[in-house]
Amino acid sequence: MKGKLKKFYNLVEALETLPSIGKKSAGRLAFHMVLHSPMDALKLAHAIEDAVSSIHRCTQCGGLSEDELCYICSDELRDRSSLCLVESARDIYVIEESGEYHGLYFVFESLNERILANLKEMIKNNGVQEIIFAFTPSMQSDATMLYIEDQLQEFHLHFTKIAQGVPTGVHLENVDMLSLSKAISERVKI
């Protein structure tokens, strides 16, 4: 049957490449697109093509942008004294959705001299006074934070990291030991 519906199976295989989409989900999506909403499928295809051809990395922070600078880096009302280091451009989106942070960001995806030089340039150009680490909690992240802090000593910055511990609504039995340990040792007065 695969040879007879080659284009359908090509669609299923393409959908399977997306995160969290397995073979069954890809098949359901393909059937829905082809049989029930072909116009929506064409709109989706156009939106994907438009996004892929128009979106690239911000030249300053490494986040997503349709221009040279992203909307955050080009916003003069942002708090330029605060710089949040994240591991991926997606992390910027997640933090922005919280509505709690109003400073700048820098995507620190890997430890290399080019990224470190870009980070130093951003600190100089914006008068950054505080670095906030928003990395996934791990021993490797802790080591990376210490390394970055050491490399940025010349700027006399204030270094902080986002709080971590027990997530809201999660039973203690389901919390990993590192998170529970940090939550206990970094407890706050109520």
From Swiss-Prot:
Keyword Metal-binding attributed: yes
InterPro entries, A to Z: DNA_Rcmb_RecR, Rcmb_RecR, Rcmb_RecR_Znf, TOPRIM_dom, TOPRIM_RecR
Annotated zinc fingers (C4-type), start-end: 58-73
Example GO biological process: DNA repair
UniProt superkingdom: Bacteria
GO MF terms, alphabetically ordered: DNA binding; zinc ion binding
Domain named Toprim: residues: 81-167
Alphabetized UniProt keyword annotations: DNA damage, DNA recombination, DNA repair, Metal-binding, Zinc, Zinc-finger
Family: Belongs to the RecR family.
Function recorded in the entry: May play a role in DNA repair. It seems to be involved in an RecBC-independent recombinational process of DNA repair. It may act with RecF and RecO.
Name of the protein: Recombination protein RecR
Organism: Nitratiruptor sp. (strain SB155-2)
